[in-house]
Amino acid sequence: MSEKPDLRQRCSDIYREIKEKKLTVVKQGAEAITIKTEFYPGEVCLLKCRPAKRWRHPILDQKLSRKRCLVEARLLAKCHYVGIKCPMLYFIDANRGQIYMEWIDGPCVRDYIREICECEIEKKLIPLMKRIGSEVAKMHKNDIVHGDLTTSNMMLESHNNPVPIFIDFGLGSVSESEEDKAVDIYVLERALSSTLPESESLFHHVLDSYAQSWKQSKATLRRFEEVRMRGRKRTMIG
């Protein structure tokens, strides 16, 4: 009979290490905590932890956490294999719900867009939108669905080299579903409009580049229009 997971110990270990080592908590969400730490001395990395959920049965919690860790690690590996920029996977401890990965030092796309003045939009943002469109097309062509494709989940190598790096595949999956891919695009559209209210013309560049980069994307783009209409109806109804 398998040993019952020590739920409290798993929770306290993470928080004690954060406190004692004075690590930098980058983000704390409902499912995971991301921490800036070192993989080995001098090598900065990002540690993503999935703390135990006290309200969930310990064995079920560990199984779900392990599954999500493995799915995310496989998505990162698949992205690298097909040439999509994302953090390099260093190490995974699925039983503890932890993934060590490359630290990306550049700004996130959300912050980069907000810093751009109106006179620089054509010069800086249009090329970035086209690049995002082509990279998302590459993702979907290879049946990679991000699951939370927002401007906060895209980093840049630097301000001077605005190449998108996709992060946080915690809600991602491998899926052939046109619906899943269409929802990815819709989430991106909503995120762009939230980041930059006058983003409609910019998003056209994302869609154009997506269509040009993936010749079999017509069905997904048709489904995107359906998803978009459903979203607008929900907004109108409230």
Curated annotation (Swiss-Prot):
Protein purpose: Component of the EKC/KEOPS complex that is required for the formation of a threonylcarbamoyl group on adenosine at position 37 (t(6)A37) in tRNAs that read codons beginning with adenine. The complex is probably involved in the transfer of the threonylcarbamoyl moiety of threonylcarbamoyl-AMP (TC-AMP) to the N6 group of A37. BUD32 has ATPase activity in the context of the EKC/KEOPS complex and likely plays a supporting role to the catalytic subunit KAE1. The EKC/KEOPS complex also promotes both telomere uncapping and telomere elongation.
Stretches assigned to the Protein kinase domain: 20-238
Family affiliation: Belongs to the protein kinase superfamily. BUD32 family.
Domain notes: This protein is considered an atypical serine/threonine kinase, because it lacks the conventional structural elements necessary for the substrate recognition as well as a lysine residue that in all other serine/threonine kinases participates in the catalytic event. BUD32 has protein kinase activity in vitro, but in the context of the EKC/KEOPS complex, the catalytic subunit KAE1 switches the activity of BUD32 from kinase into ATPase.
Catalysed reactions listed for this entry: L-seryl-[protein] + ATP = O-phospho-L-seryl-[protein] + ADP + H(+); L-threonyl-[protein] + ATP = O-phospho-L-threonyl-[protein] + ADP + H(+)
Major localization listed first in the record, in broad terms: cytoplasm
EC number per UniProt: 3.6.-.-, 2.7.11.1
Keyword terms, alphabetized: Activator, ATP-binding, Chromosome, Cytoplasm, Hydrolase, Kinase, Nucleotide-binding, Nucleus, Phosphoprotein, Serine/threonine-protein kinase, Telomere, Transcription, Transcription regulation, Transferase, tRNA processing
Keyword Transferase: yes
Assembly notes: Component of the EKC/KEOPS complex composed of at least SPAP27G11.07c/BUD32, cgi121, gon7, pgp2 and SPAC4H3.13/PCC1; the whole complex dimerizes.
Domain of life: Eukaryota
Source organism of the structure: Schizosaccharomyces pombe (strain 972 / ATCC 24843)
Descriptive protein name: EKC/KEOPS complex subunit SPAP27G11.07c
Subcellular location: Cytoplasm; Nucleus; Chromosome, Telomere
Single biological process term from Gene Ontology: tRNA threonylcarbamoyladenosine metabolic process
Residues reported in the UniProt entry to bind ATP: V26, K27, Q28, G29, A30, E31, A32, I33, T34, K48
Residues forming the catalytic site: D148 (proton acceptor)
Pfam family, one: Pkinase
GO CC, one annotated term: nucleus
Molecular function in Gene Ontology: ATP binding; ATP hydrolysis activity; protein serine kinase activity; protein serine/threonine kinase activity
